[in-house]
Structure formats: structure tokens, C-alpha cells
Amino acid sequence: MPHSKNQRKHRHHSHSERRRQPKRLTLTAKQQQMFDELLRTLNLTFANKKLLVQAFTHSSYVNEHRIQSCKDNERLEFLGDAVLELAVSQYLYKAFEQMSEGDMTKLRASIVCEPSLAQLAEELHFGELVLLGKGEEMTGGRKRPALLADVFESFVGALYLDQGMDAVYLFLERTIYPKISEGAFSHMMDFKSQLQEFIQRDNLGHIHYEIVQERGPAHNREFVSEVVLNNETLGVGTGRSKKEAEQHAAQQALITLSQKKEQ
């Protein structure tokens, strides 16, 4: 039986609708495996996996693939930036009780700046997970510091939305906080002066520094310094120079004194 005009018209619309259906973002098995491996490494879970993937989705990928249901990571980056500032501020406030507002601001700026966040993202292999457009890929976007720093922030934003602030603190305890404690950002701070002020203000006694060890070949020397207060070692630090080792030792001493004050 020949099809009526209406039936032919309806069938034509069905084909058009099928053709116009929005594309969906589908991860390859390898990409899915990489995301799973990341969560295992960080000992984290995501209830909403779409948020996790969004954190690694660059705007160039969305624009190139025209996937309607797929969002880029820019809004998550905006949120993550604020969450990261709060989490780092709280850590500094608690760990360095004697530090002035101005010094905390300087130290925080050195921690959440682009080079620092890009390095952290690189250490976590975030670049390998980013969904990029071909143009961005060809121009080396996967290794671009600005892009990596943005992804670190968007990941923090996604983690906050999915799991809350406690999960963010746990993540930072495995990534940023140990580096602060180890003095990775201490080139921005004069911890020796801060320690001296702290000791004098509270009349705790007299401190002195001792280089207790030198190790490594002459061209790659490493020094170990102790800072001692009234015959008690308050902090130990290492560095490529005696001054750097003393700065790191002073930073450890400040953390020790802050913890003692809380007890």
C-alpha cells in the first residue's frame, strides 16, 4: 500500500530528529581507566563522575566537538580558586600562629600562584587526563602551565561540590600541605626573622643554628641544619646552601612552637 503524504512527512521528521540528536561525551576505555587510576592514587571517590570529567574538559574540546550536554571546566575553575584560597589560608592560620597578616598573604600568594599549581598538576599527571581540542593539542596545550594550573583549580572545585570541604582538606594534605611544611615555598619568606621575633616576644631563651651534616658531591652539595633552643632541637631543615637549610629549619621550628602552644 502506498504511504500517505502525512506518513511520508512523519517518517522524514523522524530521520531528521535522529540526525539532530545531540552528541554525548563518551570516554574511551583508556580514558576511563586513567580517571579510575587517578582516584585510586589519591584515595578519593566521586559520586558524580560527570563533575570529575568536567574538571578536565577544556573549552577547546567542547567548542570543537559541539557536545551540547558537555560543559567545560571554567566555572569549576572559578569555584576551585576560591576554595583553594580558603583551605590554604586556614592551614597557614593554624600552622603559623605567629605569622603576620602581610606575611601570610605573601606566602599564600606563592602557594596558589600559577607556577606552583602547574607543578602540582604535573606531579599528579593531570595533563594526561585533559580533554583538549586538536588545535590546542597541537600547540602543546597539554603541558602549558596556565592550563595545568586551571585544571588543578577546577579539580578542587569539582571535589568540593561532590564531596565537601573535608575531602578538599584530605586532598591538600596529600599534595600541598606537606610541601608548605617542608619549606617548598620558603624562598618567599624570611622564617629566621619570624622565629627570632617569636622567641624574643615570648622570652623563650636563646636560639642558635648548627650545620650538622653536609652530603653529596661538591657540585650538588646538600646541607642539614638544626635550630636549637635551650639545648632542645626545634627544627631540622635541608637546603642547597647553608642559608636555605637554616630557613627550612626555622620554618620547622615555627610549626613546632605553634603546635606546642595549642597543647
Curated annotation (Swiss-Prot):
Gene3D superfamilies: 3.30.160.20, Ribonuclease III domain. SUPFAM superfamilies: dsRNA-binding domain-like, RNase III domain-like. SMART domains: DSRM, RIBOc. Residues 1-23 are annotated as: Disordered. Digests double-stranded RNA. Involved in the processing of primary rRNA transcript to yield the immediate precursors to the large and small rRNAs (23S and 16S). Processes some mRNAs, and tRNAs when they are encoded in the rRNA operon. Processes pre-crRNA and tracrRNA of type II CRISPR loci if present in the organism. Residues 190-259 form the DRBM domain. GO terms for biological process: mRNA processing; regulation of gene expression; rRNA processing; tRNA processing. The gene is rnc. The active site is at D81, E153. Belongs to the ribonuclease III family. It is found in: Cytoplasm. One of its GO terms (cellular component) is cytoplasm. Residues 35-164 form the RNase III domain. Its cofactor is Mg(2+). One of its GO terms (molecular function) is ribonuclease III activity. Signal peptide: none annotated. InterPro entries: dsRBD_dom, RNase_III, RNase_III_dom, RNase_III_sf. Its EC number is 3.1.26.3. It holds the Pfam family dsrm. It catalyses: Endonucleolytic cleavage to 5'-phosphomonoester. Mg(2+) binds at E77, D150, E153. The lineage of its organism: Bacteria, Bacillati, Bacillota, Bacilli, Bacillales. This is Ribonuclease 3. Keywords: Cytoplasm, Endonuclease, Hydrolase, Magnesium, Metal-binding, mRNA processing, Nuclease, RNA-binding, rRNA processing, rRNA-binding, tRNA processing.
